[in-house]
């Protein structure tokens, strides 16, 4: 059965334009609803230590963007929730599946976050299903995102356990080497995996990994994503938490994967690597450019909002859209 599924990735696809019905791209609405909340863009900076910290999370929330705080500074999570709520902002945190996380979730009853993401590399697991059920029992009002997965069966199981959204993508990210270290994953066919999973989903899908250009956001939405999690495009900003490094007079920011030796502090179960990215200005500028590009995508789709992207035709062009060009 699997061999009947078309296999392609972002660079293999071109969306086909429709007649434009707006007079300016500023008329295109890029907002998206997740749970009870509306956000300015359908993008989420990856919940990684070199992408997001508490300061950036606060900035994003204040400006109407969705965020997910990483889980690698465990003791700061409760104070973070409290601080966000004191400012009237949503709290969106990550948890793992180890035994102590159950007690932590139960302790959140007195100050409940609006969103919890269960964040492990291989999310189609009994440990994730058990954690979903625990969160839904203890914090029934919290919106639960679970992942990461790469098959329709996994999406259905996590949804049936109570997940409100699932995160799709096993190792397609720029600093993820799961596909090389394990032989498994959605690297090289992430967009096809997204399409496959979205057809089975009854709840929102978050595409996670493999996004290299702003046009890939529109393609993700076309193939079933409600939101798109992005790492490398959000790394390397002046505000980014990654360490700043100078090489031959140029400044770079460190960017590493969530299961890398640099994050774990040891060479154990390593599925991520570290790279240096040229420093690229302010995060707010990237968000503005993303919004403008997505508004242009909507205008090409012949609509006024994100839903128009879901209905456009496409062609599979097998690695030829760059035609020798680079960006």
Curated annotation (Swiss-Prot):
One cellular component (GO) term of this entry: GMP reductase complex
NCBIfam families registered for this protein in UniProt: GMP_reduct_2, PRK05458.1
Keyword NADP assigned: yes
Molecular functions per Gene Ontology: GMP reductase activity
Catalytic activity: IMP + NH4(+) + NADP(+) = GMP + NADPH + 2 H(+)
Family: Belongs to the IMPDH/GMPR family. GuaC type 2 subfamily.
Database matches in SMART domains: IMPDH
Residues the entry annotates as binding NADP(+): 205-228
CDD domains hit by this protein: IMPDH
Source superkingdom: Bacteria
List of catalytic residues: 176
Enzyme class of the recorded protein, top EC level: oxidoreductase
Name recorded for this polypeptide: GMP reductase
Gene Ontology biological process: purine nucleotide metabolic process
Keyword Oxidoreductase: yes
Keywords: NADP, Oxidoreductase
Database matches in PROSITE patterns: IMP_DH_GMP_RED (PS00487)
Coiled coil: none
InterPro entries linked to this entry: Aldolase_TIM, GMP_reductase, GuaC_type_2, IMP_DH/GMP_Rdtase_CS, IMP_DH_GMPRt
Enzyme nomenclature, EC number: 1.7.1.7
